[in-house]
Amino acid sequence: QDGLDQRIQELLRCQVRERARRLEDPSLVIIDTQSVRAAAGVPKTTTGLDANKKVSGRKRGLAVDVLGLIIGVVVLAASAHDNTAGTALLDQAAERCGMRLEKALVDQGFKDEVLIHGALLDIDVEVVRRNPADQGKGFVPQPKRWIVEQVNGTLMLHRRLAREYDHRPDTSASRVYWASIANMARRLTTPAPSWRDTLGLAA
């Protein structure tokens, strides 16, 4: 049934947030894109080359909250600009979070088009820049921005998401939702360890 994956995703997302003692909808989202290689047989008409990352395949865009829960997903040809993914993700986030959504964090790959689109939706889009003091230190995670990178890493553990196998981008996006649903169902059905469990593990 069309949209079933997204309806289940939204239902479980609200439950996970409530369990974490948060309101159903976030006031802040983090947006990022990741280029994923396409498997042999995936139509060339739905893929492209990310010239910056030298990846031939598709670009997967995510909008997540501070708990790492997915708010929006978009799958495009890897040749598409980050702005195209960013504006689509802002639209999804605004639709699903309503007036409560106030701010979105993006990296320096997103340009003025995304900031302007956010302003039209009454969302403050902040470009998170690297701290000059961190230059030369190697990889330094950026607070909050790192959350969406963790989500991307978790999704890559799912075999069907490690590469782009699907002929249609909307099917690929649906697989992201189902992977997210599986992760949230695990969160909701795994009891939180009590102090007794901790003592048992220590023993």
Regions found by a protein language model. Give the residues of each.
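Short alpha-helical elements
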Residues: 1-203
